[in-house]
Amino acid sequence: MARKIQAIRGMNDILPDQSSVWLYLEKTVADVVKSYGYQQIRFPIVENTDLFKRGVGETTDIVEKEMYTFDDRNGESLTLRPEGTASCVRAADQAGLLFNQTQRLWYTGPMFRYERPQKGRYRQFHQIGVESFGMATADIDAELIILSARLWQKLGLLEHVELQLNTIGLASEREAYKAALVEYLTEFKDQLDEDSQRRLSTNPLRILDSKDESTQAILKNAPNLEDFIGEESQAHFDLLQAILKANGIPYVINRRLVRGLDYYGKTVFEWVTTHLGSQATVCAGGRYDGLVEQLGGKSTPAVGFAMGIERLVLLLETLNLIPDAAKFSTDVFVISMGDDAELASFVLAERLREENSNLVVLRHCGGGNFKNQMKKADRSEARFTIVLGQDEIDKGICQLKDMSTGEQQPHSIDDVATYINAKL
């Protein structure tokens, strides 16, 4: 027997018992973002490696340790996209959508990072991203956060997530703060965890969100980022808070929140939950005014966020918030006995679908006696089973069995669709 080929570790199949939940989540997101005027954009899974080195940052964990990178046959370095923002910027700028324009865009699809697989964290994972371009003021930051809050409300998650906010200021303000932070932490370098020691010379802001207890204890007396924030950045942050308060969006300010990608500035935010253990963040984003220019485009203000589909599905399942309507179910199972009845069953099944496009009609295929077909009808968990035989064809009727009650009655073939639609 040939050896079975398995899926790659950390890259999971989405099987039919879960795909209906994914479709429900994706449709809910699509409906919400459309109501705010966002249009979908799609871009390749594979990009030039330099896009992520320049966009995400060469000293980030993603670029240093987590990217799937390879050379093609022409020797060009390519990478499976580890996140969507840089690709969205590249695609929109290449198409001429950004300069002197405002754009509201969203996307969804798989991303790839070489990480240790664990619950809620995978090597192939799926994100939904929402990005706004051409608007530099805090009102668009607020719009995105309010949009995400509306999504949580639609999904029943609003009371189960918390919004955390921070401002990390302008690049010049961050540089001044980094210098002060490095100066302070250098005295304690040997006491920092291994990752923080490495980040001290590459990406010191990331030390702020270290999970190591000893490092956090050292940080208690470290310089505060808020002391380095200038008037412009603070005014931006104050307006954002005012808009959120006016719209009844609760939040907490987390001064240690810095985000892990180099392109962020001013506003950063995360939606976190206590229901998923260590994988607490379900949505994160912020402002990235310098990224378009950094990737070769004209200076363009921008802000956006991304959310992980796997984590959201896990959260919905953990909280038992998946509505019955989101689960796949069969409404009608059609069985037939005899050649004439088989032909008639095709016609009837199509008529049912024509009269109600939301109806799920499963028609038995593959032959078999009546008993075997009824067993399959039972296993389908359909609400109704339609039985067609030669006697029914001759009389212009079908037998309709309500599988929830066991009651079976004859119905006119012409009228059975109306009856079923009224009952469902």
UniProtKB/Swiss-Prot annotation:
Keyword Aminoacyl-tRNA synthetase in record: yes
Subcellular location: Cytoplasm
Pfam families: HGTP_anticodon, tRNA-synt_His
Classification via PANTHER family: HISTIDINE--TRNA LIGASE, MITOCHONDRIAL-RELATED, HISTIDYL-TRNA SYNTHETASE
Reaction equation(s) it catalyzes: tRNA(His) + L-histidine + ATP = L-histidyl-tRNA(His) + AMP + diphosphate + H(+)
Gene Ontology terms: biological process: histidyl-tRNA aminoacylation
Source domain of life: Bacteria
Assembly and oligomerization: Homodimer.
Name of this chain's protein: Histidine--tRNA ligase
Enzyme category, top tier: ligase
InterPro entries assigned: aa-tRNA-synth_II (IPR006195), aa-tRNA-synth_II/BPL/LPL (IPR045864), Anticodon-bd (IPR004154), Anticodon-bd_dom_sf (IPR036621), His-tRNA-ligase (IPR015807), HisRS-like_core (IPR041715), HisRS/HisZ (IPR004516), HisRS_anticodon (IPR033656)
UniProt cross-references to CDD domains, sorted A to Z: HisRS-like_core, HisRS_anticodon
Family: Belongs to the class-II aminoacyl-tRNA synthetase family.
Protein biosynthesis keyword on record: yes
Entry EC no(s): 6.1.1.21
Keyword annotations from UniProtKB, A to Z: Aminoacyl-tRNA synthetase, ATP-binding, Cytoplasm, Ligase, Nucleotide-binding, Protein biosynthesis
GO CC annotation terms, alphabetical: cytoplasm
